Amino acid sequence: MLLGMLGLGIAWLVGLPFRIAAHWWTLRHDQSELGYLAWIVSDWAILAAEFCSICLALLIVMGLARWLGEHWWLPGAAVFVAIAALFNFVAPYLDYTTDPLRDKSLLADARRYESELGLSRIPIRVERVSDDTDQANAYAYGIGPTRRVVFWDTMLQEPFSAGEQRVVLAHELAHHSQSHLPEGIAWFALFAVPGAWILMRTTRRRGGMGAPEAIPLALLVVVVFQLVTTPLANTISRRMEAEADWKALQVTRDPASLESLMVGFSKTSLGDPDPPGWAQLMLGTHPSLVDRVAMARAWAERRGN
């Protein structure tokens, strides 16, 4: 448990200055009203879940290493994947901040898009963030029976039109119809196998993963491995997002709303609509706004609109 706390604490502290800088930027441009302390503790439920995941992973892997010696890494990789899948499954149950969507028109659109995308009914919920920020967002999460789509309430307000809201809804439902979250777990498995092997090799001289003194080195290796694999992970994420955009265009048949949505995002997110290549490689989990507008126009041209 102490090792899990150490691992989470180190990872959290390393990233904290960057998150503070990002929050300072949103405060400077009046995109957030949360003070620094309130902002830091706002995601305590997710942080607690991550802490439990790290503790569980370390306990199991250390037990496997003491039992199997250097052969722990393959079943250890399976443990990492199982915990990731479990976290994705239970995450919606940790959500205490959302309410059911009450917009009957948008709910009717959801039922129609679900039918076109071959989905069973997906709960659509709303997270109230307008007291804290003006930024807009929506996301899909959960797997199997816990699948959800969540709108920030700012996404359901001006300046976003009904057409833009429908595009966002279709995009998030497309993540579920294309099984992007299970696919993400599958990609994680492909990263976890070599990652576990590298952990085994690099911790050998410290007594292996079964020895407590090897844990700080193991945590460093994990951080470096994540940094090295970030460009590939971002490439995979951008492909999924582009696929969801394309599916959204197919069911809404409204490229103009997708284009205007991207213009709206450029104003509310404070992001660069056309970031340099290195930034997109290392930080871009979504296609650039310019690329997404180009997709909308290409779809319209193909349809002869």
Language-model features: where?
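Multi-pass membrane glycosyltransferase architecture that uses lipid-linked
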Residues: R206-V221, T229-P231
